[in-house]
Amino acid sequence: IIKQFDLFAKNGVKNIKIADELFVLNPRHFIAICDMIIERKYDFNIWAYSRIDTCKPQYLEKLKKAGVNWLGLGIENPNDVLRKEVHKDSYQEVKIKDIIQIIKNAGIYPAANYIFGLPNETQESLDFTLNFALETNTEMVNFYCAMAYPGSPLHLTAKKDNLPLPSTYSGYSQHSYNTQNLPSVFLSSEEILAFRDKAWKKYHTNSNYLNLIEN
């Protein structure tokens, strides 16, 4: 992997996105990469990803020194009950706001990723997630709808419950005209999708967010 970074540096590439959504997972892997970047004194501006429950404070100084200035966080949902239903085998309860603040204090910009429409999502929990995102006010945010991607636990559950699934690949896209997200027990897929679009607009026109990115 370090040879790829060597090639980037040789060709003057500064901005790098590491498209591994579990990059900050195994310290023996990502710390070794960071150490080699630091040893070479490369001046990169890196975007990397981490699960919210694997982003430990002791990693942040090393990540920052290697050039990781943006960290995409898989928050999914701030409601512990909803998250636990999806991640029964690997679920860990974490204080999300505290972790985000620690990341900010390390000089790294957090990018929060949220999912609307987990199996027992209600209108109240949708509102809670949006309000949480507004209060946390990260430099970047993504709002997704729960999608039954083939091979995922949600896909297996959807097939078991005879839920409608996309018949084309574009139906699995978050932003295609024929996107087909999952309904929850309490909300239709259309209601969840409409809320996602509303949340996107509300967040990015919110005065606190605009002040953050302007300053």
Residue ranges and their predicted role:
Residues 7, 24-214:
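A structural motif corresponding to the C-terminal lobe/cap of the Radical SAM core domain
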Residues 19-23:
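Glycine-rich Rossmann NAD(P)(H)-binding loop
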